[in-house]
Amino acid sequence: RALPPHCRRQRQMCIRDSSDTSPEISDIVDLYQDELMLFERYHIEDQIKKALDRKVWLPSGGHLIIDRTEALTVIDVNTGKFVGKNSLEETVYENNLEAAEEIARQLRLRDIGGSIVIDFIDMESTKKQQSLLNRFKQELAKDKTRTQVFEISRLGLVEMTRKNVAAGLVESFSEECEKCNGRGLIIN
């Protein structure tokens, strides 16, 4: 029951640190037997913490800020340390392309669903804007979960929806702060 459906469909091998495995899935579940704890060996806790962080670094030095609210998820793209080798417009375009790929990955990884607004870095060229949107749609096509992407708004925002399939990663690994009631700040 707890085995992810994609593991059953794709016949991937799963590792378990307990020997009590249901007979119907025993052919795709290996028992992990090592002195080093499973989470330690594969740095799973570090990976989960990284996947829950609101700041996601891009390989070039730019970064994403991912904020979840009750109404929607907002993703802000920033150049950060990325200065590029070409014109400012080309640097921004390259950063946005890299961000488009990573945003699609983060949506899958974090299982983010519902309404999503993305604030890519502003670009003057409508040709580059359309190219970015096409690239983003290509990256989203790798996702088995249904998505819908709308045109870039007059404010330069990309609005999209992604079907809610289950509780996302943040919801699965967190609880509301008792001190601030989930606001993220305490009023003095």
What are these regions (language model features)?
Residues 8-9, 24-35, 146-154, 187-188:
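Interdomain boundary/hinge elements
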Residues 26-64:
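A contiguous, basic/glycine-rich beta-loop/short-helix subdomain that forms a polymer-engagement track
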Residues 1-15:
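Single conserved hydrophobic/aromatic residue that forms the stacking wall/gate
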Residues 16, 37-43, 158-162:
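Short, solvent-exposed polar/charged micro-motifs at secondary-structure junctions
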Residues 58-188:
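Conserved glycine-centered short motifs in functionally critical loops
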Residues 8-12, 33-37, 120-124:
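Conserved short loop/turn motifs at secondary-structure junctions
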Residues 20-21:
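Predominantly extracellular/luminal regions of secreted and cell-surface proteins
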Residues 3-6, 56, 107-108:
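Structural motif
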